[in-house]
Structures are given as C-alpha cells and as structure tokens.
Amino acid sequence: MPLPLNQQNMKNIKTILCGLYTLVAIFFATSVSAQTQSYTHEGVTIKVQKIEIEVGAEKPFSVLHISDSHLVYADHRDTERKIKLAARRAKKMRNSEPIITAQRNYAIENNLPIVHTGDMMDFVSQANLDAAKRVFSKGDWIVATGNHEFSLYVGEAKEDDAYRAQSYDKVQAIYPNDLTFYSRVINGVNFVTLDNGYYKITKEQFSKMKAEVKKGLPIILACHNPLYTPGLCELIQKGDKTKPTGTVGAPFAVTEEYYHKERSAGEEWRNRNIQQRADKTTLKFHKWLQKQEELKGILCGHVHINSATQFSPTAKQYSVRAGFRGVCNLVHIK
C-alpha cells in the first residue's frame, strides 16, 4: 500500500533520495585515467591528458586546462626573506616557467584557449610578476585566481580580504581578466571564473552567478579550489576523516573532523577546520548551484590530483594535477 504524500513522508522521501545521490556520487568518483599524449618544446616534455564534457555547444571545440604552475622567482628587487623563500620553494618547482611555456606553446600550436585555474605564482614578488607577465604575453587566456596569487610569504598570515588587498591591484594589473569574477562565451558555452581561493563565496559573486545562469547558456565554471563533493572527499581522505580536503562548501560535519590542535588566541586560523570552514553564503551558494541545470562542468585545481567527481545531476567536476609537474588536460567540449 503506497504511503500518503503528507509533509512528513515527503520529507522522508527527500532524505532518502539525497542519501542515494550521495552514494552514487561517491561510487562514480574516479581518479582520471585519460588518454595521454606527450609534447616537447625547447627540451621540455609535458603530458596532455584528454577528457570530454558534453554540454550542448554550438560546435565542438577544445580548451587546455592548466592549474597550479607556481612560478617561484625572487631577485634583488625583493626582500632577502623572499629570496630565501624562492630558493626553498624552487626545490620542487624550479622548472615551472619552462613547463608553463611549453604548455602555452602547445595551446598556441593547436589554436586552443587556455583555462588556468589559479596559483600561476607561488607568491607575490617583482620577479614572479614579471614572469607571469611573460607567460600571459602570448596565447588566449581565461584565468581564475588561486590562494597563492596574493600570498606574500606563503602561510605567514591569516588569508582574508584585508590580506588579499595588500597585493590585489599589482596582481590584477598583470592578469588578463578580472580575478574576482569573469565570464566569456565560446561557441555558445559560458565560461565563468570566480575567486574562491580563501574558501568563501561572496554575496556579490553569488549575485553575479545568478545573472550568468539567467542567460540560459550551458556553463563551465572555472575556479581554483574544488567545490565539495562526497566523491572527491573520499578520494582525498581515503578513509581518514581528519585529513583536510581543500574543498569549498563542505558541510560543517566534514570540516569539523579535520585535524586541528590547541593554539594561542589569534592563531586559531592556522587550523584547517577553521580556514576551510564555509560561511552561510558559501553553503547557500553550493546548495543553490547543485540545482542549476545550466551548470555542465567545473574545472579546478588546488588539490594537485587528476579527478572526475559528480557535483550535481548535470555537472561533473574535474581537477587537474599541478601544472609544475608537467601535466595539463585537453578538454574537448561537445
């Protein structure tokens, strides 16, 4: 005998469906194992991995997705502290400019727009700004900003609006599009970028995203930090719930489990459960975005792994491995 559709039963049905959706999202979470080709430019070899997103484009086309290049330069124009920082960070990222140059050249040779999802620079320095300017001087770029774009010394202070403001203007002057929010249509597909590097979505960004949805075009969102999905959470944590996921919009029950320790007053921000905790606007944005049928895909970085996880009924989220590792994704859009 079917249950009467009263308010309580409807609530129970919705709870069951949400639970099933979460299980399906986790089941279909995958580490991307895509078709890969190699490309060499001036002695530097990169790997290009192919993925496909079906969105309903006016005609098929491709873009090159790169993230986390981490330029690591400093010179006499910077402080001694910054020069030492560059030397230390360069131990694992010293070839970042030759690699991003090879990736850019691949895009130019194949007439591909480049979608870069943040952390082009590892920290703000005059030498890094010059290097970023060289990189952006050629090619067709769509850029989202990462958390490192405005980092002065990498992890030395609380990252918030006031911290970002210290270097925002000089960074924005070098980059090819607005770093807070930007949109561009290619072959009937609306590419939207927004700054979520500090794990927050602002009310202004939320309002602008609603306006983009109202255009009625299929949307591919490009951002630095991945949006929370149960599948990506599983891939990153591998059963260890204390491991931070680096995702935006994670439920409080998830972030509260992240490893943290007692700190002195004013230093609590150093704990990931505080740093990555979503505010009300961010949680509301995340829930709202999952319901938007216009959203067809998300391109992101930050976590330095290749993955494809289900964000919503209409959109998968693709993270790409760190660009300084010589990896990028050729995204074919249909």
Language model regions located:
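Extended active-site neighborhood of metal-dependent phosphoesterases/phosphodiesterases
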Residues: 41-55, 125-218, 234, 238-254, ...
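Bacterial N-terminal signal peptides that target proteins for export
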Residues: 9-21
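Bacterial N-terminal signal peptides
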Residues: 19-29
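Short, Lys/Arg-enriched N-terminal segments with co-localized hydrophobic residues
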Residues: 1-9
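N-terminal active-site segment of His-dependent metallophosphoesterases
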Residues: 34-127
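His/acidic metal-ligating clusters that form di-metal
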Residues: 102-113, 192, 199-307
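Active-site glycine-centered loops adjacent to acidic/histidine catalytic or metal-binding residues
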Residues: 68, 118-119, 146-147, 224, ...
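Acidic/histidine-rich helix-loop elements
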Residues: 67-98, 151-174, 231, 274
